[in-house]
Regions:
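Conserved AdoMet/S-adenosylmethionine-binding subsite of the radical SAM
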Residues: 139-150, 155-253
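Canonical Radical SAM [4Fe-4S] cluster-binding loop centered on the CxxxCxxC motif
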Residues: 95-132
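Feature marks short, surface-exposed loop/turn motifs that line or immediately flank catalytic pockets
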Residues: 33, 97, 215-219
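Residues at alpha-helix caps and immediate loop-helix transition turns in enzyme cores, especially N-
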Residues: 129, 162-166, 259
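Conserved alpha-helical substructure of the radical SAM core
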Residues: 121-150
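A short loop-to-beta-strand scaffold at the N-terminal edge of the catalytic core in hydrolase folds
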Residues: 88-93
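Auxiliary Fe-S-binding modules of radical SAM enzymes
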Residues: 1-87, 238-277
Length: 277
């Protein structure tokens, strides 16, 4: 069965053309899916014949709430979703004065091996499809009744280890016929996968890149974050600089301020010791 919600509007138009339908139907189907339709039977402006064709060849992803916890302190809601294959992921909805931010997962599990992260214990099970990332935003908004204005890819998984599906998700959630959440309202957090950062820079998107350091020196970082053994922090700073040059968007991080100064001072000391200008 085809995962129709992971299709772009253009792909959907071509798919419907192959089914013998006019391509303008794609916009109708796309709109229904991005409003949270769980069944083709809900798509009342489609013919019964077309709905039957789609039901016979396509599936609509939709997660089920396993657990929902809401903080009485600040209204934060934590969701545990069950996907259609039985795997589970987490999503968190946070309230701020500037709007509602949803933190979504990009994979089932993670293979990055960071010592402080529980989601990597069982390793990476599989990547999430674009539709499954979109569903977290869409169904969190529908279930909570709160309009989502910002997205953070900082949940389970390393987004740049699933870069193609993440890129497609970004296009879907940003689409004017969908949820239309602006790129400047989206942040992507990475532990430092440099090829992924460079790939992202080539897309010239206006999202914010958030880099997790978690250590004030490269030796400590390598001990708690295996990714640093492959892509050390000096290379990471250089990749972030190239990202800024390509996009004009700074790279940030929840833990970057405290560690970054120490790391930069260390880099400067090493340069001075080597006699570099």
């Amino acid at each position: 069965m085809v995962d129709i919600k992971s299709m772009t509007l253009e792909e959907m138009g071509e798919y419907l053309r192959q089914l013998g339908e006019p391509t303008f139907r794609a916009k109708q189907v796309f709109s229904w899916l991005h409003q949270g339709a769980r069944s083709f039977d809900e798509m009342s402006n489609l013919s019964k014949a077309l709905r039957a064709k789609l039901a016979a060849t396509c599936r609509i992803t939709a997660p089920t709430v396993v657990r929902k916890q809401e903080s009485r302190l600040d209204g934060t809601i934590k969701y545990l979703w069950e996907l259609q294959d039985g795997n589970c992921i987490e999503t968190v909805l946070m309230q701020y004065h500037h709007g509602n931010t949803v933190c979504i997962s990009s994979q089932v599990g993670c293979r990055m091996g960071c010592a402080f992260c529980a989601s990597t214990i069982a390793g990476r099970v599989r990547d999430l499809a674009p539709s499954e990332m979109l569903d977290q935003v869409l169904f969190t908004q529908m279930d909570s009744g709160r309009e989502i204005s910002n997205i953070v890819l900082m949940g389970i998984g390393e987004p740049l280890d699933n870069r193609d599906n993440v890129l497609k998700f970004l296009g879907l959630v940003n689409h004017p016929d969908g949820m239309h959440i602006g790129m400047r309202h989206i942040s992507l957090s990475t532990c430092g996968v440099i090829p992924g950062i460079e790939f992202l820079a080539q897309q010239h998107l206006q999202l914010t890149l958030s880099v997790s350091l978690h250590a004030p020196d490269s030796e400590t970082r390598s001990r708690i974050m295996p990714v640093n053994r492959k892509y050390d922090v000096e290379e990471l700073f250089a990749a972030c600089h190239r990202y800024f040059q390509a996009t004009g968007r700074r790279s940030l991080g929840g833990d970057i301020d405290a560690s970054c100064g120490q790391l930069r001072r260390k880099a400067m000391e090493e340069k001075e010791g080597a006699g570099e200008p």
